[in-house]
Amino acid sequence: MAVVIRLQGLPIVAGTMDIRHFFSGLTIPDGGVHIVGGELGEAFIVFATDEDARLGMMRTGGTIKGSKVTLLLSSKTEMQNMIELSRRRFETANLDIPPANASRSGPPPSSGMSGRVNLPTTVSNFNNPSPSVVTATTSVHESNKNIQTFSTASVGTAPPNMGASFGSPAFSSTVPSTASPMNTVPPPPIPPIPAMPSLPPMPSIPPIPVPPPVPTLPPVPPVPPIPPVPSVPPMTPLPPMSGMPPLNPPPVAPLPAGMNGSGAPMNLNNNLNPMFLGPLNPVNPIQMNSQSSVKPLPINPDDLYVSVHGMPFSAMENDVRDFFHGLRVDAVHLLKDHVGRNNGNGLVKFLSPQDTFEALKRNRMLMIQRYVEVSPATERQWVAAGGHITFKQNMGPSGQTHPPPQTLPRSKSPSGQKRSRSRSPHEAGFCVYLKGLPFEAENKHVIDFFKKLDIVEDSIYIAYGPNGKATGEGFVEFRNEADYKAALCRHKQYMGNRFIQVHPITKKGMLEKIDMIRKRLQNFSYDQREMILNPEGDVNSAKVCAHITNIPFSITKMDVLQFLEGIPVDENAVHVLVDNNGQGLGQALVQFKNEDDARKSERLHRKKLNGREAFVHVVTLEDMREIEKNPPAQGKKGLKMPVPGNPAVPGMPNAGLPGVGLPSAGLPGAGLPSTGLPGSAITSAGLPGAGMPSAGIPSAGGEEHAFLTVGSKEANNGPPFNFPGNFGGSNAFGPPIPPPGLGGGAFGDARPGMPSVGNSGLPGLGLDVPGFGGGPNNLSGPSGFGGGPQNFGNGPGSLGGPPGFGSGPPGLGSAPGHLGGPPAFGPGPGPGPGPGPGPIHIGGPPGFASSSGKPGPTVIKVQNMPFTVSIDEILDFFYGYQVIPGSVCLKYNEKGMPTGEAMVAFESRDEATAAVIDLNDRPIGSRKVNLY
């Protein structure tokens, strides 16, 4: 639907193309610009769509030809009414003052006009007069104060540079009121004209030469008087205007003083439009003299260049010139990356500063399919990028040549260097933060990466770890803002075979980070000394190890080292777990040198390792040794039991279930003596065959909280998050038993009627196991256990636990509907001191799930992203917000194709809310994303 916008403040020199250039990038149909003019300089613009009109309204306050314009919503009715009103005003003005255009053919003036002029002998030839007749008639009527002849012939033959206002009704209306005292103005020296008997012989007078003054014309007898005009007080006589140069076409009578509002002489032979001669009042007279030589201001070479950022990689020089259509582009230089491909940035040189000024107005406009940023640039940037400079000698007004400006030495003035070297804390500084540097990176590599940019001496800082290798972080400070912006443009360019992330950072933030890195090194050295002095101290309790699960079974030590690239770790500190046959278990253990490095490894959680998402959990050294002795079994989606080292249930030793634990005292010999199945051991990895997963709750403390409820499917809208797979470890119940599902199954679901293990139909359990059947008293355990279970699950009379094992371990509670405990610990209402009424909920930090009003991580949904978007691009989009490392999850459909959606977890609800408010409808690539 077409939308009409009303524009006010349009200068008189602007045309439809200027308006279209102002709204470049928006769709305006042909014939959609209507200039009305008037006192407010109005125009109406018709946009094709509502979106174009909305974007157009955002440009209110911009400038067209140096004049600020205002945009208002309008309608077609208002536009038509204003156009009709303007047309009527124009027609009325034409009726009052017919134009005396010599080149226009048409009928002679109306009888009313000839009656007012009352010149029957000259009116017939007035429609198409020759230049000589016009001159003669003008001179004759001027000397006899013939007002109408002056207002038509002189206006009709006015030079074109006088503008439209010179012949407007308002301009002509002043002539009758000021022409009567013209006899007081001394004309140029003209000899007296001989008396003529009457006017009829005038056509027979031979033409008089054009050049003024006219020396031979005789005086004309008086003409019949014209109706009286209101008298005007006599004006001060003007000085003789003999010094005024002749006009072309021939001059008419000298302008009276009341016409320009001041008694100062006004030169009409200049190229300025008289509508822009300033306020028309005697208080502010305009002194204009063509003979005065005004020296033009020197042109700063830096005013000719602009920098363009964010262009499409496929953009060519012609696309850049089309983007700046209507402006005089001198040259275009597209910047390349290290392999010669366009990096989306470029420099453009214009012929004049005016073109540069207009080009800067096109910031954030559309080039092909991307919004580009246009910012000022310098000649030094142009030269550094490989652009050529042609020095042209400037011609001054007197014809003297001026040498080309010396720009390069100026940029390296001593004062500038002195300012750049200042280490004042009040200085903002132009610093960048580098991430992803190669481990062997040195200062020379950084200088080569930022080649041709002015770097402050001794400002390159590369962070090194305790092993003496680079950690991949670095800082650089530049001398000026132009080089600083150019450095930011090299974000994600390659240094060697690694792309470098270049992020802006304040000088204060840079110094704080450097100080933090140095303190970390000092603390590490102190920790090393303490470890040497007290090797058995608190080392075992420090979480300096990582347990990596859900990795391919064919993983090698080198694959793990490459996965941990950027974190200092010794090759001997990596252990890939294997079974008795030497086959990989899909797990690895890594021992780091300090807790900081171990915490860094958590950032790699759910990152791809040889095509699979690796789960990284930080554990203590004691836990690592325990895992080495009894590695937990792993299925398709990772561990089925929590890793050791998590909070144990009070009163439950860490034996039967690592991290949650069944008391080994309650299960002597790791078996159930009264089951009737000798040798059917329940291993420490879990209760295989009894429907209990061996590691269903990773780390039991919310280590998997970010994606327990949010997987590849969107939250609350997809299938339940299951833990399919087999139960590793030794068991006597035959083949592995898949655990029940989490979302809709009986895994802590609090739904009665779960089938017993004996007759559940699970593989390897074809017979009704004594003690696990449906009888009420088949299993008699110690006094701490309640009555015999009727169903080994959530049914009545479920397997009881020791006293105090009522409502689950403290601190593991969560909102209803979250991951519950194993089936044996479900909410069975059995008699005795059995399990309590509530399920054991294993969830993330408080407030992470649907419970409201609690601080904690919050997940938002991102939609309408490009299908080719990567996790790094999503993290760059949320740069500056506290995103939980490794929490970005892309969504795929059933065919494995990306859907353009993702889930991102933030460290707090406030951060997530701020991200939604600030970044909603912002573009990633060429598409605007939606945040929920």
Curated annotation (Swiss-Prot):
Disulfide pairings: none
Extent of Low complexity compositional bias: 98-116, 717-734
Location in or out of the cell: Nucleus
One GO cellular component, as annotated: nucleus
Gene3D superfamilies noted in UniProt: 3.30.70.330
Compositionally skewed regions (Gly residues) per UniProt: 783-811
Source taxon at top rank: Eukaryota
GO molecular function: RNA binding
UniProt keyword list: Nucleus, Phosphoprotein, Repeat, RNA-binding
Polar residues bias (residue ranges): 392-401, 408-417
Domain RRM: 304-379, 430-507, 856-932
Compositionally biased spans, kind Pro residues: 824-838
Phosphoserine, modified sites: S352, S375, S420, S422, S424, S525
Keyword Oxidoreductase: no
Spans annotated as Disordered: 97-116, 392-424, 717-855
Pfam assignment, any one: RRM_1
PANTHER family named in the record: HETEROGENEOUS NUCLEAR RIBONUCLEOPROTEIN-RELATED
This protein's name: RNA-binding protein 12
Organism the protein comes from: Pongo abelii (Sumatran orangutan)
Gene that encodes the chain: RBM12
